[in-house]
Amino acid sequence: MALEKLGQALNSALKKLARSSTVDEATIKEIVRDIQRALLQADVNVKLVLQLTKQIQKRALEEEPPAGVSKKEHIIKIVYEELTKFLGTEAKPLEIKHKPTVILTVGIQGSGKTTSVAKLARYLQKRGYKVGVVCSDTWRPGAYYQLRQLLDPFGIEVFGDPEEKDAVKLAREGVEHFREKGVDVIIVDSAGRHKEEKGLIEEMRQISEAIKPHEVILVIDGTIGQQAYNQAMAFKEATPIGSIIVTKLDGSAKGGGALSAVAATGAPIKFIGTGERIDDLEPFDPKRFVSRLLGLGDIQGLLEKIEELQKEQEFREEDMEKFLRGKFNLKDMYAQLEAMQKMGPLKQILQMIPGLGYSLPEDAVRVGEEKLKRYKVIMDSMTEEELENPEIINYSRIKRIARGSGATTAEVRELLNQYNQMKKMFKSLNKRKLAKMAKKFNFGGLGI
């Protein structure tokens, strides 16, 4: 997940609260100091940190929990609510109201703008929109080929001409090209040659006059931390229809600083980049984001990922029911492992399940992902009968499977043990239990 270290530090503070024998003023102040340290290490502005934690401490000391809720649970709820408010409270989804809707993207050099354009195009395509992408980056000819490489596999057309030096002309011709083709959304990738806000905004103004976009999106590099405030503020003042994508949140200790800095300007954050895969772009919802950050899960996000796979006929509903009941064989397990890999990294999935977010060390998760790939190779060496009836796999079959897959007999036995454990685990981790875990804190942002 984005902001891994910040999430672990905040989760650690809440665990300290949960383990404490009493909840007095000293305990609350200690937890607040832990939260302050976590936020400052994530490059969140000192003034913002002090404002936030002062409010958390004030509420924790003054408020009485409602009937049936413990003091500890109420304090966790206060932390959740204040962090959510800190990052903007409500989600601000991208609206596609016109046909075609024209979106202009701008960003400082190195912000991850071109990759974000490809991710946004894919995101919209998966939601049923016909998308065209215009590359008007005349400063970096490689941008056109980069977009082609990313989007050709998905059948998303990229309009561009690496030889053309007039960015405004390219943008105008590209938009006209896709209007004639009747697409739903046109995304224009502008040049990322500027290293400061003034030049960026001037280019945005020129291209905007030429193509009249319905939405202008600024792409901000999450690794710059609280410096993002200046970019976001300059952008907000320059355009009344602006929104923001914050990128590279998966690999930066300063991501919290960038998110909080942008939120402080009031400019709407609509998406965040959470990884290198083309599908690693997610709508920014402060409630669900903070819920995952605190280790409280995101059931709605998990179910949405499953629904996406269902639409792509990779993850049938009846298969999911078998999975949750523990009534599945190795053939089902193989199909589900393939589908789960398409949902994203294992760590991201675990963080959507309440209580599992930070329970496994990073090394263990990485080893787990490698083992999943190994298990698929082993299952490829099994017969159809063995996949459908794992109970018939005896020692002689284990030896044959090991030889065929280049594995050891111990690895094959390990796979079979994992299969049996997964049956038990998913049988106990049914939807009702997940909902109960999430409802414990009565958080509206969990979507339950």
From Swiss-Prot:
Entry's PANTHER family? SIGNAL RECOGNITION PARTICLE 54K PROTEIN SRP54, SIGNAL RECOGNITION PARTICLE SUBUNIT SRP54
Is Repressor tagged as a keyword? no
Subcellular location, principal: cytoplasm
What is the name of this protein? Signal recognition particle 54 kDa protein
**Taxonomic lineage of the native organism:** Archaea, Methanobacteriati, Methanobacteriota, Thermococci, Thermococcales
Q: What does the record give as EC number? A: 3.6.5.4
Residue pairs linked by disulfide bridges in the UniProt entry = none
The listed locations are:
Cytoplasm
Q: Which CDD domains match?
A: SRP54_G
The Swiss-Prot or TrEMBL record describes its family as follows: Belongs to the GTP-binding SRP family. SRP54 subfamily.
Q: Which reaction does it catalyse?
A: GTP + H2O = GDP + phosphate + H(+)
Domains: entry comment: Composed of three domains: the N-terminal N domain, which is responsible for interactions with the ribosome, the central G domain, which binds GTP, and the C-terminal M domain, which binds the RNA and the signal sequence of the RNC.
Molecular function terms, GO-annotated: 7S RNA binding; ATP hydrolysis activity; GTP binding; GTPase activity
Q: Which UniProt keywords apply?
A: Cytoplasm, GTP-binding, Hydrolase, Nucleotide-binding, Ribonucleoprotein, RNA-binding, Signal recognition particle
A GO BP annotation: SRP-dependent cotranslational protein targeting to membrane
Q: Could you give the subunit structure recorded for this chain?
A: Part of the signal recognition particle protein translocation system, which is composed of SRP and FtsY. Archaeal SRP consists of a 7S RNA molecule of 300 nucleotides and two protein subunits: SRP54 and SRP19.
Residues where GTP binds: 107-114, 189-193, 247-250
Q: Describe the function of this protein.
A: Involved in targeting and insertion of nascent membrane proteins into the cytoplasmic membrane. Binds to the hydrophobic signal sequence of the ribosome-nascent chain (RNC) as it emerges from the ribosomes. The SRP-RNC complex is then targeted to the cytoplasmic membrane where it interacts with the SRP receptor FtsY.
- Say which species the protein is native to: Thermococcus kodakarensis (strain ATCC BAA-918 / JCM 12380 / KOD1)
InterPro entries attached to this UniProt entry: AAA+_ATPase, P-loop_NTPase, Signal_recog_part_SRP54_M_sf, Signal_recog_particl_SRP54_hlx, Signal_recog_particle_SRP54_M, SRP/SRP_N, SRP54, SRP54_GTPase_dom
PROSITE patterns listed in its UniProt record: SRP54
- Superkingdom of the organism of origin: Archaea
Statement: the UniProt record of this protein carries the keyword Amino-acid biosynthesis? no
What cellular component GO annotations does this protein have? signal recognition particle
